[in-house]
Amino acid sequence: MSNTKPDPAEMDFSRVTWEKSPFSGGNDNCVEFGVIGDLVAVRDSKRPEQTPLVYTRGEIAALLAGVKAGAFDHLA
């Protein structure tokens, strides 16, 4: 298994189903997540035409663990 991620600018995101938190409300001011193979793409709903950021599932798991533990509460 390779630790190298593909260049997001060279990936096809056209078939990705994007999801956002139900807590984000009805506006377009959201972070959206989409699964693409073994990776998770992240984009800004206000700018869906921009290239998303791409993370491994392990990276997303570490982020979510930090969020759940309150590591980023000072940012809100």
Question: Where are the regions that the model predicts?
Answer:
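Positively charged, low-complexity terminal tracts
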Residues: M1-A76
